[in-house]
């Protein structure tokens, strides 16, 4: 099985390059299942009903997220009833939405997706290590293919999660920083790992934001509402190849694809 993960889609430029390249990658690389992180898809902050539907139309089977999933309050009713859009699993159970799901790939294989959020430098949540392992074990009872999007700030926390779940899940791929790391590998237990998949948006930016606005914030320390950068966009992410019989990853490849 071939699984495509698309890193944090940032605002309209990210949606534009996702619309153009996801179908192309699915076709050319014979992808069976697509996961995208959509928490920044609405202007950089959150998600809307309409944008979620668009991401699905581009080919996304499941949409994962992180702390920005709560930014658009009007999206909460959609999130509460959707089984294709995830919020981090380790939020309290009373929070709208679900944090894991088992879906069917194009080749008929069942794939579980688990969304977790870190705690270092992030909003307070339940422990992702305890909650994540327990849920991964539950999901493994339904399918050996379990993909984890770990939305976290700290590199060390992400690396620790990779080893914590090694051999139990198919892949642990980090999101949130919008800067792709170059440490993709298969861990000793057969789990594919990448500290951060990066960002799908404008490369010539400060993690998706117009550079002059980010600089103004750093120079003055005055809070300001950021605006998304404009220009040529890049799709970042990862392609994971899996032995569907046991859920172990056989290969992971980083992706950086520029729009035409």
Regions found by a protein language model. Name each.
Residues 1-260:
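Acidic, metal/ion-coordinating pockets
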């Amino acid at each position: 099985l071939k699984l495509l993960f698309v890193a944090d889609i940032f605002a309209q430029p990210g949606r534009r390059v996702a619309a153009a390249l996801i179908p192309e990658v699915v076709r050319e690389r014979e992808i069976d299942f697509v996961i995208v992180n959509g928490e920044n898809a609405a202007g950089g902050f959150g998600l809307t009903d309409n944008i979620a539907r668009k991401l699905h139309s581009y080919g996304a089977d499941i949409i994962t997220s992180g702390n920005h999933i709560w930014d658009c309050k009007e999206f909460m009713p959609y999130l509460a009833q959707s089984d294709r859009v995830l919020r981090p699993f380790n939020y309290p159970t009373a929070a709208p939405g679900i944090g894991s799901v088992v879906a069917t790939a194009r080749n008929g294989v069942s794939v579980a997706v688990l969304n977790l959020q870190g705690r270092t430098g992030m909003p307070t949540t339940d422990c992702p290590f305890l909650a994540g392992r327990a849920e991964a074990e539950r999901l493994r009872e339904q399918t050996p293919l379990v993909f984890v999007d770990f939305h976290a700030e700290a590199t060390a926390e992400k690396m620790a999660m990779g080893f914590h779940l090694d051999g139990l899940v198919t892949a642990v791929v980090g999101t949130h920083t919008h800067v792709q790391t170059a440490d993709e590998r298969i861990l000793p237990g057969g789990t594919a790992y990448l500290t951060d998949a990066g960002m799908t948006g404008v490369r010539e930016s400060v993690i998706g934001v117009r550079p002059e606005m980010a600089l103004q914030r750093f120079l003055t320390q005055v809070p300001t509402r950021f605006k998304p950068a404009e220009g040529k966009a890049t799709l970042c992410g990862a392609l994971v190849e899996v032995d569907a019989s046991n859920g172990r990853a056989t290969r992971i490849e980083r992706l950086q694809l520029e729009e035409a």
